[in-house]
Amino acid sequence: RFNPDIVCVGEMRSSEAYSAQEAARTGHTVLTTIHSNSCESTYRRMVTLCKRKYDISDETLMSLVTEAFPIIVFSKQLEDRKRKVMEIMECEILPDGNRNYRTLYHYNIVENRLEGDRFIIHGEHERVQGISESLKKRFLENGMPKEQLVRWEGEEA
């Protein structure tokens, strides 16, 4: 029996999505990649992949994957061929079971032009909102030093 600090799933392409969410919901830190079109659609994609292994309702699987992966980082290759983190989102599960999708950071494109045969794209990352109280609690319970969390929250102001 192993007790890894971090589980890395190179890319979720099939039923390994179910195993990844199981590991994440049992206290392991799981890092993985998946192809999707946005932060929010990433959860629906995980549900689809999990269903390749188990016949579980979409709603149950959505509950499992949003609990397992509260933070999604969405990156995309833009027309200038550079990859950018476009959005970082938290899925907060509310006490009534509903979900609140919170955009934490967003990449704002401030210039997008064609120069000859090259695209020129400039932008900047913008903090949209802070993390939820429940995620702060989860970070602290899982070992994030309080000083680090306070310092990070200070950057939110």
Where does each model-flagged region fall?
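Switch/coupling sub-region of P-loop NTPases
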Residues: 1-68, 76-77
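A general structural signal for short secondary-structure boundary/capping elements
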Residues: 55-57, 77-79, 117-125
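NTP-binding/hydrolysis catalytic cores, primarily Walker-type P-loop NTPases
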Residues: 87-157
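Context-gated lysine
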Residues: 51-53, 76, 82-84, 136-137, ...
